Amino acid sequence: MSSNSPTNLAERYAFLQAELARLEHAYYVLDNPLLPDIEYDRLYRELLDIEAVHPEWVTSESLSQRVGGAALKEFDSVTHAVPMLSLNNAFEDAELIAFDRRCREVLHAEHMAYAGELKFDGLAISLRYENGLLVTAATRGDGASGEDVTANIKTIRAIPLKLTRKNIPQVLEVRGEVFMYLKDFEKMNRQAAELGEKEFANPRNAAAGSLRQLDSKITAKRPLSFFAYGLGALEPQSWLPKTHEELLNAYIELGLPVCSERKVLHSVQEILAFYSEIDDKRDSLPYDIDGVVYKVNSFAEQAKLGFASRAPRFALAHKYPAQEALTTVLGIDVQVGRTGAITPVARLAPVEVGGVTVTNATLHNEDEIKRKDVRIGDTVSVRRAGDVIPEVVSVIKDRRPADAKEFQMPSRCPVCDSHIERLADEAVARCSGGLFCGAQRKQALIHFAHRRAMDIEGLGEKIVDQLVDQNLVRTPADLYRLGFTALANLERMGEKSADNLIKAINQSRNTTLARFIFALGIRHVGETTAKDLANHYQSMHALMDAGVEDLLTVKDVGPVVADSITSFMQEAHNREVIEQLLASGMRLAVEEKVISAAVAGKTFVLTGTFPTMTRDEAKDLLEKAGAKVAGSVSKKTDYVVAGTDAGSKLTKAEELGVPVIDEAAMLDLLK
């Protein structure tokens, strides 16, 4: 409650009526939710609690006596032959147990059967079929009447325009949910971002916004889906199956899509087990849900239980803990990832989201902060799904305080004080102190020791973890100062392993300039670029002193790579580590290419297992001879060198007519 909210009960009740009316108008009519569902539910339950104490205050205009918003004026209005009511919600197991007890008491039944199904987070729809043909589709609206969205519904491929069965009722109103699969939503948002168009906040908003387009051509481009789960008008009534589960099976026979995640439940224990089962798999479902629904399975028993003014007495929605909640941004810090990525993180007033107390949420990058206009002091909606890091979804701007502060991205790394860089066309800013930064230390060491870099056998992730955690190694240069005793004392190391690692470290001093450059971990500098740089500059110091214009003269080095190299080399911390490495006895050979006229300028692709060498060794031989080794087969490929167990690359080569040779033939070309 804000500081100016009413305090006495009557005033609080009036405030809730007005506030909920405002929120419902925004949600149902304007399609612009102002609060997460959990916040709306909390306010609505508070209203019901007050009415339970003061039933004399309830009038026909009370929000508890109707379902919600009116139809948009731009669409024709459709009156529902059978009202589209919402469901009562349960948030605690005790409420579910009470629901089961009431049903059994009214029906004088010892045991009940319930149909358990998912509660989708989309838009409720009624489809009216007459003699098997889809004639009208309408939104829920206020429950009594909704919007005619027939033209838009007909664009959804999951919804049949004609039912496929001989025994089709004259009139059948199918109730269900229009929604968007997560993969479709993410793809649509990616495409929108690429075109510079507005992105949707979540799949529910995307589905609702798409369905309520006045131009059905726009809706046709949106990846909407549908699941059937209920029944409206029906003629003749004799068509009606005996149970809800049988109805859904009949829908499937008619060609209607029905969710397979459902089950008939025969006790409270089975109901709670179903709730837990769906909760466990919730984060792996391909669509958003916010709970499960239980319906008395027998239609005869449903009729006996009847309806309240707002919801049926035979059904209940069992909600999961909110995956979105409101809280306040107390501050914005930046974190440095293992690759140097600088990620802004909002420090939040503690809030319960998805059953977990959240105090921090990612803001992704500087552009995202600007796009969402997140400021220190703002009230924000925070979302958490499964193991995904909590994120700030949106800002509640009408709650922004006058003293809210804009965020400024720091220019220096908070861990090592190296300068922060952001290259052209990249959303992520990064710390430039790759060889020195404590946050990047482990990743830098693992890359440095890689077999394609310095090739330090035995220096894997677990050893690196111990070396860094025990402060034995801070930079790659420290590896060459390690003593036998320090290594032998590491967990699961032993004297023999320590001796072997010392030998591997010493052997790595004899390497090539190209491998050394690659081992430094300069962003955008891979093996091939490292070889080109080594061939061009012939020494490490020459590369360290190269400017952007000079770098651009190197084969395949463009502006992004040149900027990355100069940024790395200009950082004093990195230069210091390189000098320490060179002073440790490095002997960096410059490999001379022995150009072979038969392969120079040719493109090779390697696949399968070779009899006398690894693919990496074959690649080195070809590149030294002036050939290029690619990772995939195309029409531009000159040769595919195939060993045993060659896979799809061999098939592709045969399809394209690319010459296929074996290792022996390759060696003949290199002579």
UniProtKB/Swiss-Prot annotation:
How would you classify this enzyme at the top EC level?
A: ligase
Catalytic residues, chain numbering = K119
Give the binding site residues for Zn(2+): C413, C416, C431, C437
What's the cofactor?
A: Mg(2+); Mn(2+)
Q: What does the record give under GO molecular function? A: DNA binding; DNA ligase (NAD+) activity; metal ion binding
**Which residues does NAD(+) bind?**
D37, I38, E39, Y40, D41, S86, L87, E117, R140, E177, K295, K319
The catalytic activity of this protein is classed by the Enzyme Commission as: 6.5.1.2
Show where the BRCT domain sits.
594-671
UniProt family annotation: Belongs to the NAD-dependent DNA ligase family. LigA subfamily.
Q: What does this protein do?
A: DNA ligase that catalyzes the formation of phosphodiester linkages between 5'-phosphoryl and 3'-hydroxyl groups in double-stranded DNA using NAD as a coenzyme and as the energy source for the reaction. It is essential for DNA replication and repair of damaged DNA.
- Please write the reaction equations for the catalytic activity of this protein: NAD(+) + (deoxyribonucleotide)n-3'-hydroxyl + 5'-phospho-(deoxyribonucleotide)m = (deoxyribonucleotide)n+m + AMP + beta-nicotinamide D-nucleotide
Which cysteines bridge via disulfide bonds?
A: none
Q: Which residues cross the membrane?
A: none
Q: Which Pfam families match?
A: BRCT, DNA_ligase_aden, DNA_ligase_OB, DNA_ligase_ZBD, HHH_2, HHH_5
| GO cellular component assignments | cytosol
GO BP annotations, alphabetical order? DNA repair; DNA replication
Keyword vocabulary terms for this entry: DNA damage, DNA repair, DNA replication, Ligase, Magnesium, Manganese, Metal-binding, NAD, Zinc
The protein's name: DNA ligase
